[in-house]
């Protein structure tokens, strides 16, 4: 992280909001427990790809960052009401969401996934007929599963506030599978041989930071993200948290337009 912040400090950046605004913290809401994006270490410190990214943006804008733990489904109301300035938590940009919130440019491309017990009867989407599956409330996994439940023959969708309770139910066989973002699940199961990510579901998702609709601060953050991409900070974060160099044409590297 020190190397990353050194790269940020080397950038020639600005503070369009003035000296008084520069002293105010940027309040960032995050669904802590959403590995590897934002989670708490044993000592209680918040870490993760998006925690590092939020702090890098704050460094670039010359403002401290305050992280607030909010369940995923509560992030939308929190940012709309002004309780927080930015929401992060592997939030997918969608046309539906753009009707009520704003986004900066994307910085990660993703897909959905099916996670199951490694030795269980369910090992594919085809095995979900008559089964109970879990999703995170209000997530794109929830949306995808709801749209496809009838075609897949899913008997019941159970909705959770965060990954931990869903994984407890999966391990105890109260649900037969869990549908969620693939990077989080691949990271989560890496040291859990009794669980397996068995399906990658292509959805063309892109993650970004979320703002209140029409908030001009989104333009400042968007430009900071552009500079961080140009400086290689986003690519370094990707390599740090995912163990791989992002593709040159990926949303992690390429400067992109804000979605409108």
Stretch-by-stretch model annotation:
Residues 74-77, 89-99, 146-147, 169-203:
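A ligand-binding cleft/hinge motif common to bilobed small-molecule-binding domains
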Residues 27, 32-35, 44-59, 92, ...:
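Bilobed "Venus flytrap"/periplasmic-binding protein-like clamshell domains
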Residues 64, 140-158, 197-198, 229-260:
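Ligand-binding clefts/hinges and TM-proximal coupling segments of bilobed small-molecule sensing domains
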Residues 23-90, 99, 221, 240:
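Extracytoplasmic small-molecule ligand-binding "clamshell" domains
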Residues 51-60, 122, 126-132, 137-140, ...:
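Extended ligand-binding regions for polar small-molecule ligands
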Residues 6-16:
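Bacterial N-terminal signal peptides
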Residues 51, 66-77, 157-169, 205:
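Short helix-initiation/N-cap motifs at beta->coil->alpha
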Residues 31-32, 108-116, 182, 186-226, ...:
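Periplasmic-binding protein-like
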